[in-house]
Amino acid sequence: RQRQMCIRDSHSAVRAQGSSRVFIGKVSDESADSRGHGQWHGCGVSKPSMGTVVWNCNWGQDACFESHATQPRATLFDNCRGGLVRYHAGGADTEAPNHLSDLTLWNLEVTGTIDEKGINFASDFKWWDAGNVWWKIYPPIVVGTHGQAVTFSQEEGQLTYEESTGVKVTPESLYEAQLQNRLGYVPAWLKALK
């Protein structure tokens, strides 16, 4: 049974906070502010969360996946759709970095890169900005980023691995492919969410 929650304008969507091995799936941010945009932070992680899978979720075009500092790690954003706007991941400057190692973005469909001030983050996107206390993400694995065009900084230490930027890859879902490989099948509960 599917339930829908509509809120006008708020700060965060759904997140795993201080937890391990959490699955967040099929969440769609349909809230809207005066500009028609959703939450400040999309689905994601906060505090020392680890091993989180964020699967097939959508968030606003001027948002970002949530990575709310205090050292979350080992997070998979899998086949999600939404904005890729720096600083909208969240977290206080005293709690940086926003994310430690093993952040993987798999088949992220980027729908927007412009923040509320009109700053466009579509080119030379940096994950670790040495000149800014608010944006510190350890070099992620980024595969199959597509949708709105984005280029990532090629400076040393910005990416652990990058592949097929601008093109959706197969398998569509890394999480589903791993389950198929490990279990020999994709569980019925996950198929039902599709």
What residues fall within each predicted segment?
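Long, low-hydrophobicity, solvent-exposed regions enriched in small/turn-prone and acidic residues
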Residues: 152, 156-194
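Short, small-residue-biased leader/transition segments that mark boundaries at the very start
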Residues: 2-7
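Glycine- and acidic/polar-rich repeat regions and solenoidal domains
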Residues: 8-169
